[in-house]
Design a protein with these regions (language model features):
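Domain-level signal for soluble alpha/beta catalytic cores
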Residues: 1-278
Length: 278
């Protein structure tokens, strides 16, 4: 359905078990944290796909399914609320601050009662990180910052991680990670991350290209069209095995990282391997 992607599974009850089973597959592989399926439930995506009237339901169901998975697993995991960029992914949101704040608050207010902390999910500018952090603080929730870093080790806004931390640091931050970035970019940026005086780490993706962006064809589908699979638009690294992911993660942990995980194209077997590093 257009650009709705994973949020379709929250909307249609026949797919709820898919979300539940996916959460459980990661929990049973050793994940300490699962993230609500709200990345594609941002309002702009629902407007584009003509389902904005279901905004509350789609976001609520994502949270309820995460809680159901936790309860079924009987494991003491945490639930992070995915609070994504409120426009396109991987690029800076250049709108006025009050417009960005309203969108963050609308989504965060629905998610907040169900979660342990907010995960700022792949944000691309200090301004967005600051606005989202202030929204989460108003809702009395801790925050894990997920900053998307490019090959030049800058955010899409042109800021360094150091600049973002120095200008916008919030007392409710649990830490800061490189979000949805390749293992190679993690390795390039890790020396700067280790100097920010916060818990740090990564959620690495296994896309074939280093710098994904909304210009790729998968994000242009109309509401009544089937979009290109991101695996085709971005490619995937089938040969990046769980063992390679373990070796990469071990190297980053030795640099001081304490928050590690997988993003797009990482699978339960990748998490199972890195869970051995606890």
């Amino acid at each position: 359905m257009g650009t709705l992607w994973s949020a379709s599974a929250n909307l249609e009850k026949k797919f709820h078990n898919l979300v539940l089973e996916l959460h459980l597959s990661y929990i049973n592989s050793g994940a300490d944290v699962i993230i609500t399926n709200t990345f594609s439930a941002r309002r702009i995506r629902l407007i584009q796909n003509k389902v904005n009237e279901h905004f509350k339901y789609i976001n609520e169901q994502a949270c309820l399914l995460a809680i159901k998975a936790k309860n079924q697993s009987k494991k003491n995991i945490l639930i992070a609320g995915s609070l994504p960029s409120q426009r396109d992914t991987y690029v800076e949101d250049k709108r006025k601050s009050n417009e960005i704040e309203k969108d963050f608050l609308d989504q965060a207010s629905i998610i907040s009662p169900y979660i342990d902390f907010f995960y700022l999910d792949v944000l691309s500018s200090g301004k967005e990180i600051d606005i989202a952090s202030n929204v989460a603080t108003k809702l009395n929730k801790p925050i894990l910052v997920g900053a998307h870093i490019k090959k030049n080790c800058l955010l899409a806004s042109g800021e360094t991680i150091t600049e973002v931390v120095e200008k916008y640091r919030n007392e409710n931050w649990l830490g800061l990670i490189g979000a949805c970035i390749s293992p190679e970019i993690v390795e390039k940026s890790i020396d700067e991350l280790r100097e920010i005086n916060l818990p740090f780490g990564f959620k690495a993706n296994l896309w074939k290209i280093d710098e994904p962006g909304p210009q790729q064809t998968f994000n242009t589908a109309k509401f009544n069209e089937v979009g290109t699979n991101p695996n085709i638009a971005f490619g995937k690294r089938d040969k990046y095995t769980a063992k390679l992911f373990y070796e990469f993660s071990e190297k980053i942990i030795k640099k001081g990282a304490t928050i590690i995980g997988g993003c797009c194209e990482t699978k339960p077997e990748h998490i199972r391997e890195i869970s051995k590093l606890k």
